[in-house]
Design a protein with these regions (language model features):
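Conserved beta-strand in the GNAT
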Residues: 67, 73-82, 132, 137
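Conserved GNAT acetyl-CoA-binding A-motif
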Residues: 131, 159-170
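Active-site rim helix/loop that mediates acceptor-substrate recognition in acyltransferases
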Residues: 39-65, 69-70, 75, 114, ...
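Conserved acetyl-CoA-binding loop-helix of GNAT-fold acetyltransferases
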Residues: 144-157, 184
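C-terminal "cap" of GNAT-fold acetyltransferases
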Residues: 165-168, 172-176, 185, 195-214
């Protein structure tokens, strides 16, 4: 298989939306975006597709992602970002715009929002000075083709070129394929968070954080 890594484009929005939703779920059935959006899967995907295209630039904007084309087909994606200048707080205004475009109300989104506190008990904290790798996923038909290894290499190089000397990535405890991929890319265990409220909500004990030098 021929794999090419490239910058994401606006026409990749559907792939990026799927990547975000699946990466958020990891190997479980529910993830952070299910909670935030609190809608059926098709509506979650619509929301995330719009979010990747919603200006101004933010953490989940399409420009932050890299895509792996396998034999000419978009097969996998991930993103890397600066948590200080382009972190989670940058998503708030674009999300509000998408909520308005989709006609969602606070009542529509309330069920998942009520569970966010339980999720955040294990949400990894940013490591000082680290480039953050996030939203990593491969279409099922292209798994084991080496796309993630090449994407990780490329996104780490992107962080390195932006002046970062360290990178971090987090994953759900029990996601063995993710653990193996990150170890192969040079990441090492830093810490983990476990909480019974998180496990009751998600189905796994918590989250692990890996780091590596760049």
């Amino acid at each position: 298989m021929n794999t090419k890594i490239r910058q994401a484009r606006p026409e990749d929005a559907k792939l990026l939306a799927w990547t975000m939703l699946m990466a958020g779920r990891s190997h479980m059935k529910i993830g952070i975006w299910d909670l935030i959006i609190s809608q059926p899967e098709d509506r979650c995907l619509e929301f995330l597709e719009l979010l990747t295209l919603q200006r101004p630039r933010h953490m989940c904007y399409y420009t932050e992602f890299l895509v792996a084309d396998v034999d000419g087909h978009p097969a996998a994606a991930l993103e890397g970002f600066d948590p200080v200048n382009n972190g989670e707080d940058t998503v708030t205004a674009p999300m509000v715009a998408v909520i308005q475009r989709m006609g969602l109300t606070p009542e529509d989104m309330a069920p998942g929002q009520q569970n966010l506190a339980a999720f955040m008990t294990c949400h990894p904290e940013s490591t000082e000075g680290a480039w953050v790798v996030e939203h990593v996923a491969t279409r099922p038909e292209y798994r084991r083709a080496g796309a993630i290894s090449k994407l990780l290499e490329a996104i780490l190089d992107k962080g390195r070129k932006q002046g970062f000397h360290k990178a971090q990535v987090g994953y759900y405890i029990g996601n063995t394929p993710a653990e193996s991929a990150y170890q192969k890319a040079g990441f090492k265990y830093l810490d983990e968070k476990r909480h019974p409220a998180f496990e009751a909500l998600i189905g796994c004990p918590g989250m692990v954080q890996f780091v590596r030098d760049l």
